[in-house]
Amino acid sequence: MAWRHLKKRAQDAVVILGGGGLLFASYLMATGDERFYAEHLMPTLQGLLDPESAHRLAVRFTSLGLLPRARFQDSDMLEVRVLGHKFRNPVGIAAGFDKHGEAVDGLYKMGFGFVEIGSVTPKPQEGNPRPRVFRLPEDQAVINRYGFNSHGLSVVEHRLRARQQKQAKLTEDGLPLGVNLGKNKTSVDAAEDYAEGVRVLGPLADCLVVNVSSPNTAGLRNLQGKAELRRLLTKVLQERDGLRGVHRPAVLVKIAPDLTSQDKEDIASVVKELGIDGLIVTNTTVSRPAGLQGALRSETGGLSGKPPRDLSTETIREMYALTQGRVPIIGVGGVSSGQDALEKIRAGASLVQLYTALTFWGPPVVGKVKRELEALLKEQGFCRVTDAIGADHRR
C-alpha cells in the first residue's frame, strides 16, 4: 500500500510537468541536466512529498536503476589509494541514504566512487516515531531524528551476499563498499552489538564504520569517551582480526562535530594507540548555527547540509593535525560543490562524502562535484587529488 501511494505521488509529479513539455522534461531527466534537477524537478518533488516519503522513493528508484546517465567520466587525476583499496574517485555517498543495502548498484551508477550503507543494527528496529526528518530549504539543510531504523543484520547480510561476487569485481575496479554499524536502542551491551555487526557483515564489506556519533540514539555519543571508546574498539578489532580467510575490512570510527578539544585529543590518542584504520569526520550536529531561516529549525535531531559545513571542515583539520596525518580521514558535512570537497581535502580528508546535497540537487550533483573538483585541482596546480590531501598544513 505504501509503495502504491508513493508511485501515485510520483505519477502526479510527472503530470505537473505539463503535457506539452513532458517529452522535453523526460529528456532532461534522463540526461541528468543539472539546472533542470536543481530548479524544477527537485523543488516539484519536494512540494509533493514529505521528506521521508521522498527518501523512500529515491531509494526505490535508485535500486531499480531509474537514474539519469552519469555524464562525467572519472579521470586518473581523481583516483585515490587508501584504506587498502583503490577508489576511482574520492566522492562517496554517506551512510543514511541506503540504510538497508537496497540500492548499492544504483549508487555506483550515479557516479559515486564508493558507497557506505547503514547504519545497520543487529536486530530490526523501527527507529523514532514519525515525522522524523525535516527540510530547511532556505538553509540547504535537513534535520533528522531517524534513530537507527534498520532492517537488521540478517536481512542486510542476505542482500549483500546475493551480490557478493559483483561487489568483489567492483572493488577491484575501484568502487569499494562500506558498512556503517550501529547498536540497538534497547541493547545493554553496545560493544557486543558492534562485534556482532563485524562478525556478520565484515566478510561482505571493504570498510566497517563504527558509528558512535549519531545524536538520535540515547547514550550513543557517550561511547566517544576515551575509556569507553578504547574498550569498544578493542573488541571490534579483535572480532575483525578473527574473521576467517584473508579478508580484513578496514575499521573506521565516525565522530561527531560537537566535541570539546579534550574529546578530540582523546579520540586521536585511542585511534593511534589501537591502530584504527581511519576516521569519518563528521556526523550531523545538534547545534543550531545562528542565522538559520527554516521554519523547522528548532526540531530535535541532527542538522546536516550547508550550515555545519565549516564546522565539519575545521574538525577534519584538527583531527588531521592530532593524528599527524597518519590516519586517513573521510570528510563529510555540507559537500555540494567541488570547492566544498577541495576545502575538506586540503584540510586533511583523503575522501569525501555527501548526502544532503542529493535532497536539493538530485543525482547530477555527483558529477558536478567531481567536475568542479578536477577543475579546481588543475587551477591550483595539483597533478592529482592525492597531492592536495592536507595541503593547508604544509603552507
From Swiss-Prot:
It is a single-pass membrane protein. InterPro entries: Aldolase_TIM, DHO_dehydrogenase, Dihydroorotate_DH_2, Dihydroorotate_DH_cat, Dihydroorotate_DH_CS. Residues 1-10 are mitochondrial matrix. Its EC number is 1.3.5.2. It is found in: Mitochondrion inner membrane. The active site is at residue 214. The keyword Mitochondrion applies. Substrate binds at residues 99, 144-148, 211-216, 283-284. GO terms for biological process: 'de novo' pyrimidine nucleobase biosynthetic process; 'de novo' UMP biosynthetic process. Gene3D superfamilies: Aldolase class I (3.20.20.70). Monomer. Catalyzes the conversion of dihydroorotate to orotate with quinone as electron acceptor. Required for UMP biosynthesis via de novo pathway. This is Dihydroorotate dehydrogenase (quinone), mitochondrial. The lineage of its organism: Eukaryota, Metazoa, Chordata, Craniata, Vertebrata.
